[in-house]
């Protein structure tokens, strides 16, 4: 779409905002159109979500709900992005690679579970970790060696970098990618629970990307100046549109789950955006709900192994609230509210520097 401007005297299609808008609506329409067809196909093939044997009783009724919906909304976002991005932008190409590779890892994991009808099948934790490390290196190393990406570490509410991580930045970035990917995966346990916070996180990071990629805005707001970063906003917009199309069918009661193909890809992509926009530390606030879910699992496992006692009735923490009697819809909406507030606070850091 960018190259259509070469065929006319107008620069309309060169604007990032215009192409982001087109990408959003293309992905939204694709997702809304393809998702019901996928649901019908998945039901016919019995490609449903295996339910964990210790899950709350209310989850037993979801055993026939189709999974792997992430494959559709990720594909919709990628197709829409390919129509709208500039192909000579290394940030945009690396971002698409991240989305595709982490989706493939999740898809392999999903297929193992669906084919064997066992929630413990799929990729082993060790194989999944290895695959995530390899995918992360494929996405990060080209940026590192091209010197397009700064290795300096920034913290929220402070305009200067703390220090230069140099070669150690690679290990830190891989940690961010893997942590973010698995955190969203842990959160995806209730209908729409991971979807809406992901939309909030993508929106917040998209704003940071746009501002940092614009030399005038970044200078005025004292943000890191990274030329070419704005192009990734188009992919953000496409993914938000695709997620909104998915949410139409994923909201309570869900007609389809995203599966690992969706959650691992979303988390990996959110982590990647935090890295290239230099918001690795602020990601703790941007993805606060994901952090909360992950910390609850770490506390539960650690406490049980060390003290033989559980901190929560069940982890991740959304299952704890189910066990104490909260209805599913109430948990979902309250977590959405927390995600919205944490992202608004993250955006406030733009001016508080």
Swiss-Prot record:
EC supergroup of this enzyme: transferase
GO biological process: cell division; cell wall organization; peptidoglycan biosynthetic process; regulation of cell shape
Membrane topology note: Multi-pass membrane protein
Metabolic or biological pathway, per its Swiss-Prot or TrEMBL entry: Cell wall biogenesis; peptidoglycan biosynthesis
InterPro entries noted in UniProt: Glycosyl_transferase_4, PNAcMuramoyl-5peptid_Trfase, PNAcMuramoyl-5peptid_Trfase_CS
Keyword Translocase included in the entry's annotation: no
Chief location: membrane
Key words of the record: Cell cycle, Cell division, Cell inner membrane, Cell membrane, Cell shape, Cell wall biogenesis/degradation, Magnesium, Membrane, Metal-binding, Peptidoglycan synthesis, Transferase, Transmembrane, Transmembrane helix
The protein's name: Phospho-N-acetylmuramoyl-pentapeptide-transferase
Record organism: Campylobacter jejuni (strain RM1221)
Taxon lineage: Bacteria, Pseudomonadati, Campylobacterota, Epsilonproteobacteria, Campylobacterales
């Amino acid at each position: 779409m960018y190259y259509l401007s070469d065929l006319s005297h107008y620069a309309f299609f060169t604007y990032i905002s215009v192409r982001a808008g087109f990408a959003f609506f293309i992905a939204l329409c694709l997702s809304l159109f393809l998702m019901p067809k996928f649901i019908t196909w998945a039901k016919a093939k019995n490609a449903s979500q295996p339910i964990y044997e210790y899950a709350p009783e209310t989850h037993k009724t979801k055993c026939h709900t189709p999974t792997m919906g992430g494959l559709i909304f990720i594909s919709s976002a990628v197709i829409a992005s390919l129509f709208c991005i500039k192909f000579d932008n290394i940030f945009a190409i690396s971002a698409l690679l991240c989305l595709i590779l982490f989706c493939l890892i999740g898809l392999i994991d999903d297929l193992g579970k669906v084919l064997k009808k066992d929630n413990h099948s799929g990729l082993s934790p060790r194989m999944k970790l290895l695959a995530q490390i390899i995918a992360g290196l494929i996405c990060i190393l080209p940026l590192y060696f091209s010197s397009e990406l700064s290795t300096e570490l920034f913290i929220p509410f402070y305009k200067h970098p703390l220090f230069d991580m140099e070669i150690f930045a690679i290990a830190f970035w891989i940690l961010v990618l893997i942590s973010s990917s698995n955190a969203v995966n842990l959160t995806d346990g209730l209908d729409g629970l991971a979807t809406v916070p992901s939309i909030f996180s993508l929106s917040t990071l998209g704003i940071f990307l746009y501002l940092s990629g614009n030399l005038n805005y970044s200078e005025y707001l004292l943000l890191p100046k990274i030329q070419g970063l704005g192009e990734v906003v188009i992919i953000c917009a496409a993914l938000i549109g695709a997620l909104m199309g998915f949410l139409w069918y994923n909201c309570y009661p869900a007609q389809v789950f995203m599966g690992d193909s969706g959650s691992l890809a979303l988390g990996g992509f959110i982590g990647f955006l935090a890295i290239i926009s230099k918001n690795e530390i602020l990601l703790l606030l941007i993805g606060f709900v994901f952090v909360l879910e992950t910390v609850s699992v770490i506390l539960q496992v650690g406490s049980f192994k060390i003290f033989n006692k559980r901190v929560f009735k069940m982890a991740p923490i959304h299952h704890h609230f189910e066990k104490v009697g909260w209805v599913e819809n109430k948990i979902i909406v309250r977590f959405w509210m927390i995600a919205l507030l944490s992202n608004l606070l993250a955006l406030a850091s733009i001016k508080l520097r």
